Amino acid sequence: MTDQVGRVGSDLLATIVAATRHAVGERERGCPASELTSRAASVSPGGARFVAALTVRGRVNIIGECKRRSPSRGILRADYRPDRIAAAYEAHGAVAVSVLTEPTFFDGSLDDLRAVRAAVEIPVLRKDFIVTPYQLLEAVTAGADAVLLIVAALDDAELGALLDQATSFGLGALVEVHDAAELRRAVKAGAVVIGVNNRSLRTLAVDLDASRNLVGQLPPGTVGVAESGLRTSEDLMSLGAAGYKAFLIGEALMTTPEPGVALGRLLDGARSGDGDARVLARGVEAGGS
């Protein structure tokens, strides 16, 4: 994977999006959109429940992520069982679960999403590079309650159309931004849940100042979610005090021996006001982001 990322150069996102469009075309030839539309008609995603889960006052709202691999770190977990990980997240206080389904760069699949859906009651987010309506239908039929929409991967027309279509299917949408220009585009498109990714999808660099710099620009009525690079209870407390309603945490949990226990430690530290930077590190040798 390191060699693959090296060949991509400075714009990994463009490479992933191109690969995604090709892969989706292949899947659609095997299973037409009309067939998925028929299946989706009998499914009722919990999009409203997803949004509600992120906005409970007086609670630290964590979306725990299931992810086998990342382009920046390679394999995160050889013994990857997303259903068991998700169940552990739920047992230790996660309000939702994010599941990577992108196959080429993250080794994810819709089967992972289905397994998680069967294992938990809390809302499930399909995290992928959504660029076509077909992927929304896939998400619905696989059991997702919400999807990730990455502003940097879409033009304004695509973003608006996918957001509207997701809503019409009953899906929630976590609309991801990295800078002020992308935030303005998300707001213009009508995004309600806005995730600020501290990791640049073009360079993979992580900077928590992305979340700190943008929180003041989130309009009233939107739900801010801080993503990537969150490792300690202190991170959650400081960003929560700044105005974020929820936090999406992936690699920092996936690289611990017991991801659910690690999530519980973060929650306990944030609830008690223990901002010790070692709260999560006590359960991890490899580190994470």
Task: For each feature predicted by the language model, list its residue ranges.
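Glycine-rich phosphate-binding active-site loops on the catalytic face of alpha/beta enzymes
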Residues: 138-158, 196-204, 242-263
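Catalytic-face loop-and-helix region of soluble metabolic enzyme cores
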Residues: 193-249
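N-terminal active-site wall of soluble small-molecule enzyme domains
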Residues: 61, 66, 73-174, 180-185, ...
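An N-cap/entry alpha-helix motif that binds or orients negatively charged groups
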Residues: 2-79
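Structural recognition of alpha->loop->beta junctions
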Residues: 83-95, 188-200, 243-245
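Catalytic cores of alpha/beta
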Residues: 131-142, 178-189, 226, 230-249, ...
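Active-site beta-loop-alpha junctions enriched in small/polar residues
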Residues: 19, 67-69, 102, 129, ...
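C-terminal helical cap(s) of enzyme catalytic domains, especially alpha/beta-barrels
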Residues: 213-217, 240, 255-288
